[in-house]
UniProtKB/Swiss-Prot annotation:
Name assigned to this protein: NAD(P)H-quinone oxidoreductase subunit K
UniProt remark on cofactor binding: Binds 1 [4Fe-4S] cluster.
Function: NDH-1 shuttles electrons from an unknown electron donor, via FMN and iron-sulfur (Fe-S) centers, to quinones in the respiratory and/or the photosynthetic chain. The immediate electron acceptor for the enzyme in this species is believed to be plastoquinone. Couples the redox reaction to proton translocation, and thus conserves the redox energy in a proton gradient. Cyanobacterial NDH-1 also plays a role in inorganic carbon-concentration.
UniProt enzyme class: translocase
Record's subcellular location: Cellular thylakoid membrane
Catalytic reaction annotation: a plastoquinone + NADH + (n+1) H(+)(in) = a plastoquinol + NAD(+) + n H(+)(out); a plastoquinone + NADPH + (n+1) H(+)(in) = a plastoquinol + NADP(+) + n H(+)(out)
Family named by the database record: Belongs to the complex I 20 kDa subunit family.
Keyword terms, alphabetized: 4Fe-4S, Iron, Iron-sulfur, Membrane, Metal-binding, NAD, NADP, Plastoquinone, Quinone, Thylakoid, Translocase, Transport
UniProt xrefs under InterPro entries: NADH_UbQ_OxRdtase-like_20kDa, NADH_UQ_OxRdtase_20Kd_su
Annotated source species: Prochlorococcus marinus (strain NATL2A)
Cofactor(s) for this UniProt protein: [4Fe-4S] cluster
Amino acid sequence: MELNPLKKSPSSEAVRNLREASCGPVGTPTVTNDLSENIILTSLEDLHNWARLSSLWPLLYGTACCFIEFAALIGSRFDFDRFGLVPRSSPRQADLLIVAGTVTMKMAPALVRLYEQMPDPKYVIAMGACTITGGMFSADSTTAVRGVDKLIPVDLYLPGCPPRPEAIFDAVIKLRKKVANESISERSKITQTHRYLTIPHKMKRVESKVNGQYLKAKTQLIALNPSLSEEFDQSLKEVQKISEELSSN
């Protein structure tokens, strides 16, 4: 039997090349522009923060005129739905508490109860001067809370009397940035200091200047500065004496 001279056995080099091609590591594929635009690399924490900042469900706690400015956001002129804000009527379905208006001692326990019923993570926006410091209603009132941060922790302060709808949008954008940079592990460690939950509110006593005495005072300056009363009486006597001398002559 004669072997075919044209049919030769493969060389060792060809066998080696075939083995490397079939058993070797796969080469790095080329990444096209279409592939890079359709793949996003992120972490689970960033994905969780992105989902929360895009769907903030606020609980509206309005007690005074600042709440009217927030009600203007519902209209088509501002359209707060584009931020994913869906107002809720139950604290158990909300993650954002917007306090707008004066908080009194009688309403303080109800506000704290609503905050405690909200699931974590939760955020608070103090809207308006009356909410942040007590405003003009705390000048001579013993029932107004001088700052809602004495009751619940506040994440963002929105000053104004009242703040405009554009300012409310700016506050929401700043809160979204805070949520985006937040860490789940660090959020549970945040605690509030100087928190008072008792009904007898701890606040600094401020003597009121508007106490009705200005109605009995001779001038408005004396009503604000009672120490000037003697000087005013003395100068008034001198003026009367001079006027009598002039009239006699």
